[in-house]
């Protein structure tokens, strides 16, 4: 919350606070949308976002196009082909109380001059998805991306059972909806992640996003994603006049639509709907985080239009977080793979959002101090993203007399070494490279599916190997023998042979798996692949300068600094030597990006307008991008070529005024044949 009302800030104070809020929000957006690994709850993000909105409303001159309040959605992932959305996929405005929702309805009625019917829908907690069909056949699936340009995830969408590959009628159309992960599938996925030494997903939304954006469609297929479709683009083509009719029309074509949508003509009906699903949401097999109101009349939707970021004809009501009261009996500190020491509250078991909760993350020492959380305190819990239990506040009035502040450790709970703060980070960290807890986490991570993929080497086996002093680092894995493994509990000949075979097979992995498996700070699987493909082998990466690494697309200075620091360590250099001597592959042997041959559009910025006899616009866009073109949605001085079909309209006129070269469909076909 702001220290005072936005209108009481001086311009200088407001500017400083705006810059601070934008920096923080952009970091959280990166974690949420691109890394699929949020570090704060939706409520914390929303509070900061509304503070920024308030300051920008008080001082409009501080609004910039790159402000989080002006941008839509995700940062584009360079691993996927880009898709230009012919009609932008906008975000959605939101409110956080029924009073705010009623005020929005009053403004709506005032604007249009009469009462408004709304189609009321559940707000599915997932990832926005666009599907394009030609003659009834699915030809493209894409994410929202930044609203104008998304990611082509067609191969992954084809693995989702609820997405029809062929419609019940041979129609050409675009629909939009939500890709989500059911609660049961999320529980199975996180159980598998933990068994294989991976990091559990924070919530089903991030699990869905991470699963849909997999480079390997087989991984997506195993994640049990589902969809609800709720938007029909250009419905007038099909004589559909209301949102409720659109949902019925899409359902008749074979799409899965949510059965809970209904038309409401007044706020009393909407209030009843909200109360019903506030109560029943935990019983649903999928996550929802609110209710969506959409003007039901599609012609009125078109009349109301959009702002830069959101439609004026729809709004989301966000549920308040559900809370439960409990007592903290202990705070335990655990050491992670990178040495970060994290506190967890151990509490009386309590029912919260449909599950029994007995532990909750406290994140870091600063949170314990800021909220003054003490052992013995009565606290209120909520579930961040409806999944992760967190302490929302302390009920100080119920605190026992003379309860001391919670002790913050000065030494590592695993190895006893003094804990430190690196740079200006909040986390406490153990920097002992031989810390047993870290080594166990590192070994488990190294063997995980997305790293070296050593099947059968999970946390329990790693713990046994450590306890029997058979391994002290990842290089030791490659010196294990059948006699060594025979010392493990319940390890017979078959298990021994399977594990030795998996370890031996991992020697041949392309080096990006090794880079990821080493657990370098900030280096995830995608960054590891980019680095491996760019440098070709580990030796070139190890000897590259920080500047050279930072210049690699999508890497940047933070990752570059972490890599240089990591490989400077004598213990790391010794480890790499040992891996080399164990015949572990250090070269990139994965697929390389195809080089686009010279074509009439290679490297050019192209705009498409009008209707074509031989192409749909999405198919033509995809074909031109495959030839090396950058296809955009508007004509400017930077446009190299306009491809104009029939009824080209204003884009053709603008291109002519700017002397942009223009190509018709006949000329286009001739060029494509060359």
UniProtKB/Swiss-Prot annotation:
InterPro entries: BRCT_dom, BRCT_dom_sf, DisA/LigA_HHH, DNA_ligase, DNA_ligase_AS, DNA_ligase_CS, DNAligase_adenylation, DNAligase_N
Residue ranges of domain BRCT in the record: 596-674
Gene3D superfamilies from the UniProt entry: 5' to 3' exonuclease, C-terminal subdomain (1.10.150.20), 6.20.10.30, BRCT domain (3.40.50.10190), DNA ligase/mRNA capping enzyme (3.30.470.30), Helix hairpin bin (1.10.287.610), Nucleic acid-binding proteins (2.40.50.140)
Residues binding Zn(2+): 412, 415, 430, 435
Keyword vocabulary terms for this entry: DNA damage, DNA repair, DNA replication, Ligase, Magnesium, Manganese, Metal-binding, NAD, Zinc
Active site: 123
Binding-site residues, NAD(+): 42-46, 91-92, 121, 144, 178, 294, 318
Cofactor(s) the protein needs: Mg(2+); Mn(2+)
Catalytic activity: NAD(+) + (deoxyribonucleotide)n-3'-hydroxyl + 5'-phospho-(deoxyribonucleotide)m = (deoxyribonucleotide)n+m + AMP + beta-nicotinamide D-nucleotide
Pfam families for this protein: BRCT, DNA_ligase_aden, DNA_ligase_OB, DNA_ligase_ZBD, HHH_2
Gene Ontology cellular component annotations, sorted alphabetically: cytosol
GO molecular function: DNA binding; DNA ligase (NAD+) activity; metal ion binding
EC code(s) of this entry: 6.5.1.2
Coiled coil: none
Family according to the record: Belongs to the NAD-dependent DNA ligase family. LigA subfamily.
NCBIfam families listed in its UniProt record: dnlj, PRK07956.1
PANTHER family: CHROMOSOME TRANSMISSION FIDELITY FACTOR 18, DNA LIGASE
Name of the protein this chain belongs to: DNA ligase
Organism: Lacticaseibacillus casei (strain BL23) (Lactobacillus casei)
Originating gene: ligA
């Amino acid at each position: 919350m702001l220290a005072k009302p936005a209108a009481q800030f001086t311009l200088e104070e407001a500017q400083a606070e705006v810059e601070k809020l934008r920096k923080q929000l952009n970091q959280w957006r990166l974690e949420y949308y691109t890394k699929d690994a949020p570090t704060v709850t939706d409520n914390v993000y929303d509070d900061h976002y509304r503070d920024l909105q308030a300051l920008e409303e008080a001082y409009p001159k501080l609004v910039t196009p790159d402000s989080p309040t002006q941008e839509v959605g995700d940062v584009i992932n360079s691993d996927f082909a880009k898709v230009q959305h012919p009609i932008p996929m906008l975000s959605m405005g939101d409110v956080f109380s029924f009073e705010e929702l009623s005020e929005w309805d009053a403004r709506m009625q005032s604007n249009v001059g009469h009462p408004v019917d709304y189609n009321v829908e559940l707000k599915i907690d997932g990832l926005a998805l666009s599907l394009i069909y030609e003659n009834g056949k699915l030809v493209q699936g894409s994410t929202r991306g930044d609203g104008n340009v998304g990611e082509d995830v067609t191969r992954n969408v084809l693995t989702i059972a609820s997405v029809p590959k062929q419609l019940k009628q041979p129609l050409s159309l675009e629909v939009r909806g939500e890709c989500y992960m059911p609660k049961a599938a999320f529980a199975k996925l996180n159980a598998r992640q933990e068994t294989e030494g991976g990091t559990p997903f924070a919530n089903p939304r991030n699990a869905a996003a991470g699963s849909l954006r997999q480079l390997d469609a087989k991984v997506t297929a195993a994640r049990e994603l589902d969809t609800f479709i709720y938007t029909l683009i250009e419905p007038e083509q099909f004589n559909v006049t209301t949102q409720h009719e659109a949902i019925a029309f899409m359902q008749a074509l074979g799409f899965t639509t949510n059965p809970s949508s209904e038309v409401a003509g007044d706020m009393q009906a909407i209030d009843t709907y909200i109360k019903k699903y506030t109560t029943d949401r935990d019983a649903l097999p999928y996550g929802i985080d609110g209710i969506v109101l959409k003007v039901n009349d599609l012609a009125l939707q078109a009349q109301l239009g959009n702002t830069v970021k959101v439609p004026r004809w729809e709004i989301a009501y966000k549920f308040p977080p559900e809370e439960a009261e409990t007592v903290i009996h202990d705070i335990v500190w655990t050491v992670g793979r990178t040495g970060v020491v994290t506190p967890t509250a151990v509490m009386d078991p309590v029912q919260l959002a449909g599950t029994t909760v007995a532990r909750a993350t406290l994140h870091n020492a600063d949170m314990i101090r800021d909220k003054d959380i003490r052992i013995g305190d009565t606290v209120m819990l909520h579930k961040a993203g409806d999944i992760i239990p967190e302490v929302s506040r302390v009920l100080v009035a119920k605190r026992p007399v003379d309860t001391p502040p919670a002790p913050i450790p000065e030494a590592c709970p695993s190895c006893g070494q003094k804990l430190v703060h690196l740079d200006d980070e909040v986390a406490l960290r153990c920097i002992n490279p031989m810390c047993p807890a870290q080594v166990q986490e590192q070994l488990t991570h190294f063997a995980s599916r997305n790293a070296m993929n050593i099947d059968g080497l999970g946390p329990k086996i790693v713990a046994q190997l450590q306890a029997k002093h058979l391994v002290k680092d990842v290089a030791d894995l490659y010196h294990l023998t059948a006699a060594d493994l025979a010392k493990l509990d319940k390890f017979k000949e078959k298990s021994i042979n399977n594990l030795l075979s998996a370890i031996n097979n991992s020697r041949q992995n392309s080096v990006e798996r090794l880079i990821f498996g080493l657990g370098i700070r900030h280096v995830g699987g995608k960054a590891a692949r980019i680095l491996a493909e760019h440098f070709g082998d580990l030796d070139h990466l190890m000897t590259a300068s920080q500047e050279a690494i930072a210049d690699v697309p999508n890497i940047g200075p933070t990752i570059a600094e972490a890599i240089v620091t990591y490989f400077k360590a004598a213990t790391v250099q010794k480890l790499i030597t040992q891996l080399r001597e164990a015949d572990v592959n250090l070269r990139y042997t994965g697929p390389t990006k195809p080089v686009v041959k010279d074509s009439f559009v290679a490297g050019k910025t192209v705009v498409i307008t009008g209707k074509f006899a031989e192409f749909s616009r999405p198919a033509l866009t995809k074909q031109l991008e495959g030839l090396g073109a950058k296809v955009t949605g508007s004509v400017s001085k930077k446009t190299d070529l306009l491809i104009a079909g029939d009824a080209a309209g204003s884009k053709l006129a603008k291109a002519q005024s700017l002397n942009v070269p223009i190509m018709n469909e006949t000329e286009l076909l001739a060029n494509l044949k060359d």
